[in-house]
Amino acid sequence: MAAKIRRDDEVIVLAGKDKGKRGKVLSVVTESGRLFVEGINLIKKHQKPVPQLNQPGGIVEKEASIDVSNVAIYNSETSKADRVGFKIEDGKKLRIFKSTGKTI
């Protein structure tokens, strides 16, 4: 199946503790259907120091993955969550917003 949400897309969270927040997609894990969103689903990780890499130890906040079904692509034109459709133009498959029909 084609990827409806890709890296660098702006998404809005539909469910969970960060519902309603927006962020940029950092990476997508296609095998598990999960993605990492900037500033969303933050966890605290207790990290040991790594002297070889010059990394200090301590409690570090980082993004955890979120299921792709819990986010929707954000349409800045309508300021709402939107669905993604596909259109073939000149032999290329383009992603479009379902509500407006404009390319992403």
Swiss-Prot record:
Pfam families in alphabetical order: KOW, ribosomal_L24
PROSITE patterns to which the protein is assigned, alphabetical: RIBOSOMAL_L24
Annotated InterPro entries: KOW, Rib_uL2_dom2, Ribosomal_uL24, Ribosomal_uL24_CS, Ribosomal_uL24_KOW, Translation_prot_SH3-like_sf
Domain of life: Bacteria
Keyword field: Ribonucleoprotein, Ribosomal protein, RNA-binding, rRNA-binding
Segments traversing the membrane: none
Molecular functions (GO terms): rRNA binding; structural constituent of ribosome
HAMAP family in UniProt: Ribosomal_uL24_B
Similarity remark: Belongs to the universal ribosomal protein uL24 family.
Quaternary data: Part of the 50S ribosomal subunit.
Described purpose of this protein according to its UniProt entry: One of two assembly initiator proteins, it binds directly to the 5'-end of the 23S rRNA, where it nucleates assembly of the 50S subunit.
NCBIfam families: rplX_bact
Name of protein: Large ribosomal subunit protein uL24
